[in-house]
């Protein structure tokens, strides 16, 4: 017997041909994962058989295929005309008795005691949808807050018609699907009241790098369509799976989205408008739309789903404001990252620089350049020529035909999981989304470069810049004669860099985190109450979403450090405590009140001297608290501490005492405290310093300037800066031998070995334990060392 309607709990992934990917997946989760803690709202689906029989018995099938067989889909106006006619025919044709009876019976059961107040979502599920090689982002329609039987029947009709959207017709032709081989199933599902809570999308993989140890969650207030479409810039969270599995706090990143609008149920339904878009209260926009506990609960559900399907997943979720529960409303295989070749790495690097016109969230890691075309609406799509950069407010599936032609895409609105981002990834072109003002700051005809090669933030430059692309194979790296580690400053790039061959991080700098993720002088946060009014306002905006100014500083450090720690776990990550100079601290918000005006900051109030001074001690305590949380609370004990610029043995002792006072005792929980060996005094008295510290990491930049008496910020004598000078090498050799003799760690994290392969080889010959390199030189230097010393 062929069924017309099936309940979700009767369905599983083996039913894709009967009810399409979306409905089969909902059934799969309800049948298999309900007891494991995955909550999916109930519902039923019409079958592909019902759809095909409806078209056949009504005589529509022959009419439709007659039109499609002769259609040239690249003729935009002919496509629009054909699509419109076909959809109208379907909507005007009544359902046969049996199909309508079965839908009515199922609907009455689903409605239960709630009566006509109950609201439903009616979604399309195509039988060829979510084939792992095509993500069909939003190809068919969704109807929300549908109430009452009559409205449900109308919605099901529209869902059936949506199989013949212009974009769906064109997509099938371009992907090589036969129109007759695709059918449509309508899913009718109880609505989750996220209109009075929040909702969003999550991936069980990092969407940009393919890093598999995190769950990436986006969230905003109201119904989830806004996040999916990219109509809103959502909050973002990254959760580290191994830490979550260990029962520890596992959120390694939080980004507060601007969240200006939300979609809610409409009070006036007379025109069939079941939903409406309203502004979000500015105070709400400045808070996160999920609590930490909710973020972790979602990540747990995501992991259960991923384990069950045994592949990376793309999941839509919704929080019910009425019962406070978190529900999964859709799950499908993640289609882009999991297809990529993990064994080759492509690197894009800009060659020049230019003025920055605007910035937003970077999608992918590529660079694109061309002539800007700023489009106000889809009606202007014929303006786009192949190779142009598409600039617009936001995109939806109707834009797909022209997105294929663009060399890059720039939007005002949207987050990492919005429509523009998904399609850009699928097409392999760079996109910068959520810029806010791109359509104002860029004009049609401008020559621009869109760069996603610089981390989480994507930049649009005001001219066409040249760039290099290098491809390296990393599957068969030879044995290296020493540990090759990496220098990582920007947590935004950590997941990406972790794909390179490595033995951990020899230098994780706090400066980038303080400068870019925090941006405020720690003293200005500690003394927030006494700041001038306008400064208070500026700081309040920057710390939105965090419970206090002090907590903001600590939390942001925790996020930056734990992101790098998690990305490279279980390998060591050596975190250097802050090494800003007074002029750099001066430039942070509020910094002018606290920093001296030094003649030569390079040789002034920096490093260990700063930590032990009365003036800075309370700021250093914040850094210590952050390290403590990463190691002791989150359990990332692969994170170690490094102290920079220790001028005297006495100063070294004071820092170790200070760390212990702050709860960071050497040896406790395996904690090592490494010293930057970067002053001639460090090498000359290496033995005495090694009495105090657990090892050395050589800072060749400072060692060179202090040995040769150069200011490395001065351009006049820059040509004399050379870490391969014999005097510098003599000191480095002393330091390496001293550490070897004591059986203590010695590595190098200065620029030298990244710039000069022969210098790296010399260090290995001296017996150094590790060389820590800039990510862009890791593969080349590794191969050089293996070839020449292996």
Task: Indicate residue ranges for each PLM-predicted region.
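Conserved metal-phosphate-binding beta-hairpin within the catalytic cores
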Residues: 138, 310-335
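Conserved short loop/turn motifs at secondary-structure junctions
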Residues: 13-15, 46-52, 87-91, 176-177, ...
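N-terminal beta-alpha lobe that positions the nucleotide/phosphoryl donor
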Residues: 1-187, 196, 285-293, 301, ...
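Extended active-site and interfacial segments that coordinate phosphate-rich ligands
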Residues: 136-170, 194-268, 329-361, 405-412, ...
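Conserved catalytic alpha/beta cores of large enzymes that bind or transform nucleotide phosphates
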Residues: 214-314, 319-320, 361-368, 386, ...
